[in-house]
């Protein structure tokens, strides 16, 4: 894969351009503020009734309704929730873009699954920091950055990649490294990771471990500590140095037990199911299911949220976290 750094990107590609960042959430605020501090002409596009309007203005940013921001801009970055992007695009973005504009995304979902089909005369790019927005902002203010992905879906002007690299540099990404990919690979790996490991697989593993201990007669408090609370300690080791760092850092007892018992839990049958999950991402079944869920008022999602919030691990966890001074919110 191609990896780019500071010397490979030219901020001059953005200078003199009008830049609209749509959304002011985790990623939106980081992109807008970092680009502003890099000397760019930035406007944030929001609904007039959005609670984020005041926050953005207090941070020194210009704020306009989405349609006005798009009409003014040469480059439009869409950092809105996946499920709202299509409607906003059709009502407020598409009617106000002109030939030669750049349409940018932080995630490839709507382009890859054809929910948004831009006209052929605009550039379509992606700049996706591989960190939450607060870290994108913090590392930038410290003079550093986080790794980013870039991709070009459509290059009408012949300059799309240069624009993507310049944007990545403007938010600090080239100080860490910018990896070139494509919308398909970014979207499919991102969704699979969320479903099979990060949000789906890990949550179910935690609940199954907790339930196993409680059903065997152990106190819920101990089960919580062993299966939920201490997971952060292990994940931090993975994050810092991979699997080897974790194995080096834990006791020999833990290392041996993990290496000999772990494969009994994550079996070939589990991997086979992971492949099915990946197939549903690849062929669009998950995307269609999620879109139908959104259009249907989130009935299934709301039911699942309620079921999860009522799980015993949530109740005992809330009680135990109140004992942890570093977690208690004032």
Curated annotation (Swiss-Prot):
One GO CC annotation, please? cytosol
Q: Write out the catalysed reaction.
A: (2R)-2,3-dihydroxy-3-methylbutanoate + NADP(+) = (2S)-2-acetolactate + NADPH + H(+); (2R,3R)-2,3-dihydroxy-3-methylpentanoate + NADP(+) = (S)-2-ethyl-2-hydroxy-3-oxobutanoate + NADPH + H(+)
The entry assigns this protein to a family as follows: Belongs to the ketol-acid reductoisomerase family.
One matching Pfam family is KARI_C
Q: Which residues form a coiled coil?
A: none
- Residue sites binding Mg(2+) 1 per the record: 190, 194
State the pathway, as annotated in the record: Amino-acid biosynthesis; L-isoleucine biosynthesis; L-isoleucine from 2-oxobutanoate: step 2/4; Amino-acid biosynthesis; L-valine biosynthesis; L-valine from pyruvate: step 2/4
Names of the cofactor(s): Mg(2+)
- Give its E.C. classification number: 1.1.1.86
Per the record's keyword annotation, is Oxidoreductase included, yes or no? yes
Residues annotated to bind NADP(+): 24-27, 47, 50, 52, 82-85, 133
Name recorded for this polypeptide: Ketol-acid reductoisomerase (NADP(+))
| Lineage summary | Bacteria, Pseudomonadati, Chlorobiota, Chlorobiia, Chlorobiales
Query: Which terms does the UniProt entry file under GO BP?
Result: isoleucine biosynthetic process; L-valine biosynthetic process
- Residue ranges of domain KARI N-terminal Rossmann in the record: 1-181
Summarize where substrate binds, as residue positions.
251
Indicate yes or no for the key word RNA-binding.
Answer: no
Q: Which UniProt keywords apply?
A: Amino-acid biosynthesis, Branched-chain amino acid biosynthesis, Magnesium, Metal-binding, NADP, Oxidoreductase
One annotated GO molecular function: ketol-acid reductoisomerase activity
Q: Where does this protein come from, organism-wise? A: Chlorobium luteolum (strain DSM 273 / BCRC 81028 / 2530) (Pelodictyon luteolum)
**Residues binding Mg(2+) 2:** 190, 226, 230
- Active-site residues are 107
Summarize the protein's role. Answer: Involved in the biosynthesis of branched-chain amino acids (BCAA). Catalyzes an alkyl-migration followed by a ketol-acid reduction of (S)-2-acetolactate (S2AL) to yield (R)-2,3-dihydroxy-isovalerate. In the isomerase reaction, S2AL is rearranged via a Mg-dependent methyl migration to produce 3-hydroxy-3-methyl-2-ketobutyrate (HMKB). In the reductase reaction, this 2-ketoacid undergoes a metal-dependent reduction by NADPH to yield (R)-2,3-dihydroxy-isovalerate.
Instruction: List each copy of the KARI C-terminal knotted domain by range.
Output: 182-327
According to the record, cofactor stoichiometry and binding are noted as: Binds 2 magnesium ions per subunit.
